[in-house]
Amino acid sequence: MYECFLLFVSTNASNSQALVPFTYHGAEHKKTFLAANRVFEFSKLTNQRIKITQKYKANGAGLGSAVWDGSFVLAEYMQRKVDVKDKCVVEIGCGLGLVSIVLSLRNAFVIATDGDENLFPILKENFKDNIGISNVNKKTSINLLRWGNRTQMDNVINKCPNGIDLIVAADVVFEHDPLKKNVKNNLHSANVTFPLLYNTLKYLSSHNKKKRPEIYLAYKQRYSREGSFFSLMQDSFDVTHISRRDIHRDFIKAKIKIFKFLLKKEVQITNTTTRKAKDEL
């Protein structure tokens, strides 16, 4: 069963707001990223709407300050298809927290991580608004995680005493427009960020001695160089493509895909027996 999801948009000059049904190919799609609030419904969260506050800017500043389509696609898939009850889940690049919130409401303990501390105040508010103040500390943890930082990765691992069960990420694999040459884009170029993300996923996957954590990653193709990340992943992970039939019907024809990764057994043995020096990743 699928549920529609909805968003708040301004409807007139007085800036009053109304709840407007969303479709991926509808006229309102581009407005969703600029809306102050978005509201989502999920089939397994009956009688509950998730409200997410956004602070995205039209100039592209603060990419984590809006809910991108991949976050909804991943959250919607996970709540229907993956049993997360009593699991310890790590979200990489959580942004405004939609995926983490949904999994928490499905009774997982979720460690929401991001490399941008400026997002944390709004992220905390989204958690409180949807999970409840009394449950936030019981069911979630917000952690700074800059990809490749050994100390921060160890802090995340230590939040799961019995080991990480699941790792999730949405819209973290992207390359900026290669025609735009500036410092910010260079810092986010594929040859810098993709190896860091790969090593982070590999490290976090190597420390559960009982089982290998499953990784679910939602991805929307933008530029061809993004394929280099998946080439890296194939070196150490078994890769499964989630069927498009299992994706929300609004996105079946979109370019959003969900991948499932599982660390290869021989890689897990190597990583757990050979420890690198601190912060060497």
Task: Kindly give the residue locations of the regions a language model identified.
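S-adenosylmethionine-dependent methyltransferases
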Residues: 2-281
